[in-house]
C-alpha cells in the first residue's frame, strides 16, 4: 500500500458507513495529482494511534527528571498501555518542514556534514510521545514518498506529549537547524538538530502557563524571538537567549481592546516571557503571520478571527465563525485574504483589505483541521501586473473537458491576467478539498440588506475606497459563469437577502439552508439534530484543554475579555448569514485517508498531507512525478537521493547518551 493507504482494508470509518474508496489521484484543470508510492504503510514503533501513553498534564515530572527536560527519558522498548477502550486522545499530528539550499536550484544537494544535517530538507512530525525526523520531500521530481520506516532521528518523551513544533527557516543552514517543540503540559523546548549539545527548556516549572501549547511560530526573519499559544487563550512572546523567571511572572497592562489585552512582563533583568496576549475566550488554536510579517491572524475556540498589527498591538480586523470554534488559519500569498476552517464544517474567506467575509466554502462533512493557500497556482500577482499594464485579455478559454473517472466537467484554465486564488482544506471527515477563489466572487457586491453592525467593532465598517478590488481588476469583472467559478448561485443584489425564501435558496444544501434560519444558540440547543458522525466528531479534544495556572490565568488588572453575543452577531458584517455571501463548491473533494486529516502543505512540486494515524502522503503535481527510467535519465539535473546513507543512519542511532534531556535517540 502506498504511503497514505490507497488500498487499505476497512477502518473504523468504513464500519460506520463511510465506504468511499480512498483515492490515489485526483484531477484539476492543470492535470492529475498522483500519490507517490512509499516504502512503508506506516511508521514503525510500538505506539498506536488508538492506545497512546496517558499524558500527565497536572503532575510536573518530579525530581531530577523535572530539571532535565519536559519529561523523563523513556525506554524505547516500553509499549504504552493497551486496553479495549479508545484511551486518551492523542495530540493532533503536526508536520514541520525546513528547506536547506535553493528550492529551485540546479539539482546539486547542498554540502552538509554527515548526520542529521546531511542532504536537503528535513521533515519533523509528532505522533503520541514521539518525534520523528525524515529527509525532505520532492523538489524537482521524485519517484517515491517518504519512507516512514527509516527515520533519521527519533525522540521519545515520557510524562508529556509533543503537540506542535516549528523550524526556524530564517537561520536554517548547514551548521544549524533550530527547532521549537511545544508540549501538552505547557513546556517549550528549543533544539538544534546539528548542534546536539544545544537544548533549552522554557516554562519548565510551568509557572508561566500550565495548559498545553497549541501552536508555535518563530517571528518572521528573527533568530531568537518566537510566539507560543496555549489552551488558556494566552499568547506569549519568548526570546531563546533569555532565561525564564523563577517565580510566577507579574504583568502590567499595555493595551486592551475588543476581546483582547496585551501585557508586558515586570522584570528588571531580561526574562521570559517578554509579553503576554490574552486573546478571546477559550483556547487559542492557531495563528499565522502575514506574508510581510506585519500582521498576526489568530483563531480561537470562541469562533473569532482576530487580526492584529503586531508591532503596535492594534486590532485591525475581526470575523466570527458561522458556528463553533475556528481551528486553522492561513494568509493568501499577497496578504489580501485570510482563509479559516473550523467546527462549522466550512471554510471562510475573509478580506483583510475590505474587512468583510467574501465567501464561504461547503464541502466537508466534519470539522476542518487545516487550510492552506497554494502559491504556485494562484494568479493574483499576474492579474495585477496585467491590469496595471493595460493589457486586455483577449484569449479565449479552452473548451471544457470531462473527467474520465466521474464524468463531471473539468473547468478550463482561467484567462491570462484573471484573478484566481487556489487554496486547500483537510478535515476530520478524511476529505481533502481544493478550492478556487475567482474574480467573479471577489468583485464588489452590493451591501447586505438588513445587515446590522455593531458600533465600534472592527470589521463592521469596510475600509475606505482604494482597498476595494474594483481598481485592481482592470477591465471590469468577468461574466458570472459557474463553469469558471466553483461558487453556488447567490443573490446579485441585497434587496431580497432577508426575504422569506432566502433561508432555503435553490442550490444551497438543505443542511446549510436550515442553519441559515437558526441563531447560534438555537443550533447549540438542538443536540438531537447534529449532523456529525460520531467517529468524525471526536472533536478537538486534543486542541482544547481546561485548567491552568489558577493565579496566572486570571487577567491581571481591569482588562476583561469581552464576549460577542452570537445571537446579535449573526447577520452582521462580522458573521453574514449563509445566503448573504457566495457559497463555494470544492474544485476537488476526495477521501484520501482512513483517519482524520491534520496536515496540509503546498510545495513547488507536490502537496503534503498527513492524518492522525501518522501517515504522510506526497501528491506529485501534474508532470512532476517521474518513473524510474525518467529519474535515471535526469540524474544530475534536478534530483538527488532522498534517503540518508547507511552510515548516516548508523551514526545517528549510535549517539552517546549526552543527547538532549528527556529523549531516547
UniProtKB/Swiss-Prot annotation:
SUPFAM superfamilies: WD40 repeat-like
UniProt-annotated location(s): Cytoplasm; Nucleus; Perikaryon; Cell projection, Dendrite
Positions of modified residues (N-acetylalanine): 2
Taxonomic path: Eukaryota, Metazoa, Chordata, Craniata, Vertebrata
Source domain of life: Eukaryota
Sorted UniProt keywords: Acetylation, Cell projection, Cytoplasm, Methylation, Nucleus, Phosphoprotein, Repeat, WD repeat
Chain's role: Regulator of the deubiquitinating USP12/DMWD/WDR48 complex. Functions as a cofactor that promotes USP12 enzymatic activity.
Protein name, entry field: Dystrophia myotonica WD repeat-containing protein
Amino acid at each position: 500500500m502506498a504511503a497514505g493507504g490507497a488500498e487499505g482494508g476497512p477502518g473504523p470509518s468504513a464500519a460506520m458507513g463511510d465506504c468511499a474508496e480512498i483515492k490515489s489521484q485526483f484531477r484539476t484543470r492543470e492535470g492529475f495529482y498522483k500519490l507517490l508510492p512509499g516504502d512503508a504503510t506506516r511508521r514503525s514503533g510500538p505506539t498506536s494511534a488508538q492506545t497512546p501513553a496517558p499524558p500527565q498534564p497536572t503532575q510536573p515530572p518530579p525530581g531530577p527528571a523535572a530539571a532535565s527536560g519536559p519529561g523523563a527519558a523513556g525506554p524505547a522498548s516500553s509499549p504504552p498501555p493497551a486496553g479495549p477502550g479508545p484511551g486518551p486522545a492523542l495530540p493532533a499530528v503536526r508536520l514541520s518542514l525546513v528547506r536547506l539550499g535553493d528550492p529551485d536550484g540546479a539539482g546539486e544537494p547542498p554540502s552538509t556534514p554527515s548526520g542529521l544535517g546531511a542532504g536537503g530538507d528535513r521533515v519533523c512530525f509528532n505522533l503520541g510521545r514521539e518525534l520523528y525526523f525524515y529527509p525532505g520531500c520532492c523538489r524537482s521530481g521524485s519517484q517515491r514518498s517518504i519512507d516512514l520506516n527509516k527515520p533519521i532521528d527519533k525522540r521519545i518523551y515520557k510524562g508529556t506529549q509533543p503537540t506542535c513544533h516549528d523550524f526556524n527557516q530564517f537561520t536554517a543552514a548547514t551548521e544549524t537547524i533550530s527547532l521549537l517543540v511545544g508540549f501538552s503540559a505547557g513546556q517549550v523546548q528549543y533544539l538544534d538538530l546539528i548542534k546536539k549539545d544545544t537544548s533549552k527548556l522554557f516554562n519548565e516549572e510551568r509557572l508561566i502557563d500550565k495548559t498545553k501549547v497549541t501552536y508555535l511560530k518563530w517571528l518572521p526573519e528573527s533568530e531568537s524571538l518566537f510566539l507560543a499559544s496555549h489552551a488558556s487563550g494566552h499568547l506569549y512572546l519568548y526570546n531563546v537567549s533569555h532565561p525564564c523567571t523563577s517565580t510566577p511572572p507579574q504583568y502590567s497592562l499595555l493595551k486592551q481592546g475588543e476581546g483582547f489585552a496585551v501585557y508586558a512582563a515586570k522584570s528588571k533583568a531580561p526574562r521570559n516571557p517578554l509579553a503576554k496576549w490574552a486573546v478571546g475566550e477559550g483556547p487559542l488554536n492557531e495563528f499565522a503571520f502575514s506574508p510581510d510579517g506585519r500582521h498576526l491572524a489568530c483563531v480561537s475556540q470562541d469562533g473569532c478571527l482576530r487580526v492584529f498589527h503586531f508591532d503596535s498591538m492594534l486590532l485591525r480586523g475581526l470575523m466570527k465563525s458561522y458556528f463553533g470554534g475556528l481551528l486553522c488559519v492561513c494568509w493568501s500569498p499577497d496578504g489580501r485574504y485570510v482563509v479559516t476552517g473550523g467546527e462549522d464544517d466550512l471554510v471562510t474567506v475573509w478580506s483583510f483589505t475590505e474587512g468583510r467575509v467574501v465567501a464561504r466554502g461547503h464541502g466537508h462533512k466534519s470539522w476542518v483541521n487545516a487550510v492552506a493557500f497554494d502559491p504556485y497556482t494562484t494568479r493574483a500577482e499576474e492579474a495585477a501586473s496585467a491590469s496595471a499594464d493595460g493589457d486586455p485579455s483577449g484569449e479565449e478559454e479552452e473548451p471544457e473537458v470531462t473527467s474520465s473517472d466521474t464524468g463531471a466537467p473539468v473547468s478550463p484554465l482561467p484567462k491570462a491576467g484573471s484573478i484566481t486564488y487556489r487554496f486547500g482544506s483537510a478535515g476530520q471527515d478524511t476529505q481533502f478539498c481544493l478550492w478556487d477563489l475567482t474574480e467573479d466572487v471577489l468583485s464588489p457586491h452590493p451591501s447586505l440588506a438588513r445587515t446590522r453592525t455593531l458600533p465600534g467593532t472592527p470589521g463592521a465598517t469596510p475600509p475606505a475606497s482604494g482597498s476595494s478590488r474594483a481598481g485592481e481588476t482592470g477591465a471590469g469583472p468577468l461574466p458570472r459563469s459557474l463553469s469558471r467559478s466553483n461558487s453556488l448561485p447567490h443573490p446579485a443584489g441585497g434587496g431580497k437577502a432577508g426575504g422569506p425564501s432566502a433561508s432555503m435558496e435553490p442550490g444551497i444544501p438543505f443542511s446549510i439552508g436550515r442553519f441559515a434560519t437558526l441563531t447560534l444558540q438555537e443550533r447549540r440547543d438542538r443536540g438531537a439534530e447534529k449532523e456529525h458522525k460520531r467517529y468524525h466528531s471526536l472533536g478537538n479534544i486534543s486542541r482544547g484543554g481546561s485548567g491552568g495556572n489558577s493565579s496566572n490565568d486570571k487577567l491581571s488588572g481591569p482588562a476583561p475579555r469581552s464576549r460577542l453575543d452570537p445571537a446579535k452577531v449573526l447577520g452582521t458584517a462580522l458573521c453574514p448569514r449563509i445566503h448573504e455571501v457566495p457559497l463555494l463548491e470544492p474544485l476537488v473533494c476526495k477521501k484520501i485517508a482512513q483517519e482524520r486529516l491534520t496536515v496540509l502543505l503546498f510545495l513547488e512540486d507536490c502537496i503534503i498531507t498527513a492524518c492522525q494515524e501518522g501517515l504522510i502522503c506526497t501528491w506529485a503535481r501534474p508532470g512532476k512525478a517521474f518513473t524510474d527510467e525518467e529519474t535515471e535519465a535526469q540524474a544530475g539535473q534536478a534530483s538527488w537521493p532522498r534517503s540518508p546513507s547507511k552510515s548516516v543512519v548508523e551514526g545517528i542511532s549510535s549517539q552517546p547518551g549526552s543527547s538532549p534531556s528527556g529523549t531516547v535517540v
